Amino acid sequence: MVNTILVPVAVAIVSVLVGGCAGYSIRKNKWETQAQNAAHDAKHILADAESKAKAVEADLASQKEAMKKAAADAKKEKILEAQEEIHHYRERVDNELNERRQEVSRQENRLLQREDAIDHKDSLLDQKDSQLTQKENQIKKLQAQVLEKENRADQLVTEREKKLYEVAELNQEDAKKIVLDKLSDQLVKERAEMIEESNQLAKAKADHFARKVIVDAIQSSAADTVSEKTVSVVNLPSDDMKGRIIGREGRNIRSFEALTGVDVIIDDTPDVVVLSGFDPIRREIAKRALERLIKDGRIHPARIEEMVDRARKEVNDDIYEAGESALMELGIHKMHPELVKILGRLKYRTSYGQNVLSHSIEVGKLTGVMAAELGLDEKIAVRAGLLHDIGKSIDHEIEGSHVEIGVELARKYHEPDLVVNAIAAHHDDVPKLSFIAELVVAADTISSARPGARSESLENYIRRLEQLETIAKGHIGVKQAYAIQAGREIRVMVEPDKISDARTTILAHDIRNQIEQDMEYPGNIKVTVIREKRAVAIAK
């Protein structure tokens, strides 16, 4: 029973063992096969990974090389840009340095010119000082000579007294009287000579100082010149605008002329309209109004009236601003507003081609500089110089001369008495009550009589020169006469056999008087009479 049971059990165990061994062997073979396959796959994967790694390394190397090249190119480009920028900067610096060198050179030249001018003036002053010193030394020598002569005269008196006692047997009183009379006559003559020489020396000093004051005043001022005219020209965009300016049946041009008080001249001149009138303020108002009408394009009586009113207001504002600018330029304060406005009107007033406002400003500057040199009231002097021709602003509207009108305006607006007298006396109509009035006359003469300050038409100019020469030639003994200095001087050549030296002075005064009676002219005319006698002998 037991054996029966054990046999199957043993068989089962053996079967299990044999099956386990066989299964193990089969599994082992399978595992080895899988291991070989895995090793083979691993080799392939490793080979692929190595090839990919090499490719990546090569790619990285190429990228690195490209980056190095790009960096080098960028660096090179930046270096080029930097070099170019440095080049441009260097050029700018060189240009600035050249400009500064040129400016420094110009300033050095100006300084050298000023130094030369100053040295020239110093040399002139030194010469004048040396001349004055020589004159003083001469006077001292003359005084010493006079003293010596007085001592000699005393000796002569004593000697002559003795001789008179011996020869004429005169008493002492009679002899003394004779000697003293002769000595007195001699001393009077010598004293007169000394006084004359002292007067000439004093006059030379005064002339030198006066010239210095006037030259300093002239150098401190400069004024523009203008040309006198009675017409204004307005440019048109086209000739078609002329018909619109005239208007239907001429109503536009009649309205414009009635409102402005000027004549509108429309002729064949292309693209131009001429405004004619003696009053420059009206002409300026008309010009501005017409220019605005042309620009606006709407031209009819109502629009014309509006534009004329606007232009009149603008011109009045400009007039007041011109007066204020003149006061600011000269440093004048506290003037009546109405007088400022009247002063500004001089901007549109000319006299012999010279703008009266510019002339008045120049006279104010000159008067102020000369007053300062002489220690006078500079502010009053400047004020008097500026207002000396104030009457010319309205002399065509009010009856009377510009001097009378100016005096009336100055009194009306409470100007100082010195200013009123300077205005009244600047043409010698009334006596001058102060040195400031004299300075105003001098400054007015400098400003108006200097060459180029005033002008006149060519026909009047030639006629005036011919009249000057005719007047001079009409006198007996005159050989030839020449008008020079733009008619501001007439030089008269006389026949020495008919006119003596003493007679030349009388002839100059006669010609001057006839010029003053027969001619009208700006400024002054100098009459110079020249008498020359030549003696010729030929040696053979």
UniProtKB/Swiss-Prot annotation:
Residue ranges of domain HD in the record: 356-449
Protein name: Ribonuclease Y
Biological function: Endoribonuclease that initiates mRNA decay.
InterPro entries per UniProt: HD/PDEase_dom, HD_domain, HDIG_dom, KH_dom, KH_dom_type_1, KH_dom_type_1_sf, Ribonuclease_Y, RNase_Y_N
Membrane association type: Single-pass membrane protein
Domain KH span(s) in chain numbering: 230-293
NCBIfam families with a match to the protein in the record: HDIG, RNase_Y
Taxonomic source organism: Lactobacillus johnsonii (strain CNCM I-12250 / La1 / NCC 533)
Stretches assigned to coiled coil: none
Pfam families (UniProt xref): HD, KH_1, RNase_Y_N
Gene designation: rny
Family according to the record: Belongs to the RNase Y family.
Chief location bin: membrane
HAMAP family recorded: RNase_Y
Places the protein is found: Cell membrane
Domain of life: Bacteria
Disulphide bonds in the chain: none
GO biological process: mRNA catabolic process
EC number: 3.1.-.-
Protein keywords: Cell membrane, Endonuclease, Hydrolase, Membrane, Nuclease, RNA-binding, Transmembrane, Transmembrane helix
